[in-house]
Curated annotation (Swiss-Prot):
Keyword set, alphabetical order: Ribonucleoprotein, Ribosomal protein
UniProt cross-references to PROSITE patterns, sorted A to Z: RIBOSOMAL_L33
Segments traversing the membrane: none
Pfam family, one: Ribosomal_L33
Gene source species: Prochlorococcus marinus (strain MIT 9303)
Record has Ribosomal protein as a keyword: yes
Family indicated by similarity: Belongs to the bacterial ribosomal protein bL33 family.
Example GO BP: translation
Gene3D superfamilies (alphabetical): Ribosomal protein L33
Protein name (record): Large ribosomal subunit protein bL33
GO cellular component annotations of the record: cytoplasm; ribonucleoprotein complex; ribosome
Length: 66
């Protein structure tokens, strides 16, 4: 029998500063992305977490894109 997938889904977090600003004041070119899981029942809205961006070389807010 197949197992139920459950309520946890895989999401992608993307740096807000890398996306909005061009390559000004950056260590290198690119957009920082992290993948993580979230519980759909507990967190229905889009997730926003402060994480380290290796392109900006500082901690920035990362927002859920998918």
């Amino acid at each position: 029998m197949a197992k139920n997938k459950g309520v946890r889904i895989v999401i992608t977090l993307e740096c807000n500063e890398c996306r909005s600003n061009p390559a000004i004041d950056k260590r290198s070119h690119g957009v920082s992305r992290y993948t993580t899981e979230k519980n759909r029942r507990n967190t229905t809205e889009r997730l926003e977490i402060k994480k380290f961006c290796r392109y900006c070389n500082k901690s920035t807010t990362h927002k859920e894109i998918k």
